[in-house]
Structure formats: C-alpha cells, structure tokens
Amino acid sequence: MHCPFCSTEETKVIDSRLVSDGYQVRRRRECTKCHERFTTFETAELVVPKIIKNNGMREPFNEDKLRRGIQHALEKRPVSADDVEKAISHITHQLRATGEREVPSKLVGSLVMEELKKLDKVAYIRFASVYLSFENINEFSNEIEKLKD
C-alpha cells in the first residue's frame, strides 16, 4: 500500500485487528521510508441490492446516505461513532443477506428503526416520527408506549 505521506510503495503492517463485529479489519501501518504511521480499514466488497424508492425509481444503495440519516437522528445523543458504524455494517450485512438484486426502501427504513431502537430510544422516536409520518401527538404517544414494553 502507498504511504499517504510520501507515496512510497513500501509500508509494513504493525498491527491488525477485527472491528465492526468482524466485518472489517483495521490495520496499523508504518512507512519504511518516512516512518509515518497510518491506519487502514479493509472490508470485503460484496454486492448490495439496489433500492426501490416509494415512487418506483431505483437507485444504488448509498452507505453515506444511510450514515447521514442515522447521524441526523442521533444528533446530540450520547452514541459513539463506533456504535454507529456497527449499526451501518449490520444493516448493510442484512441487505446483502437477502440475496435479492433489489429491495424496497421500506426494508431499509425498517432495518434503520431496529438499529436505532437498540442504540438510543430518543433517536428512534425522532426517526420514526418522520419515517412513519406521525400526524398528531397520539401517534407519538403510542410509539413511546410501545418502547416501554
């Protein structure tokens, strides 16, 4: 791998460990020329199904869009970046595991809600209020009551 500091091709791995529940390998590397250290992440490149939007349009799965949506729901909540990445990896893994070439966006929304429910109840309600299109306070109350069970 090329050194990001001096562009030489000679780098060596000084530490490797599994992260994201074993779906990624984190490698600590050192350049043999300039001796700078840097971190790389390695993941298997697998096909993620296309997303069928509610209007019938199809678009490629966009992990950045998923991340932005989850981070928006979690804004100012005490959830670590590592936990967010684990949730994203879990959702992506579940989408791949369907074995389908295309999946409805509703499936992605449901998977996000499941992960947010585990991460942070407030973020779950924030996301659910938009995703489920709450129109009045009773719908909020009903969803909050479900969380208490």
UniProtKB/Swiss-Prot annotation:
One of its GO terms (molecular function) is zinc ion binding. Keywords: ATP-binding, DNA-binding, Metal-binding, Nucleotide-binding, Repressor, Transcription, Transcription regulation, Zinc, Zinc-finger. Residues 49-139 form the ATP-cone domain. It holds the Pfam family ATP-cone. Its cofactor is Zn(2+). A zinc finger (unnamed) spans 3-34. One of its GO terms (biological process) is negative regulation of DNA-templated transcription. It comes from the Bacteria. Binds 1 zinc ion. Belongs to the NrdR family. Negatively regulates transcription of bacterial ribonucleotide reductase nrd genes and operons by binding to NrdR-boxes. This is Transcriptional repressor NrdR. It comes from Mannheimia succiniciproducens (strain KCTC 0769BP / MBEL55E). The gene is nrdR.
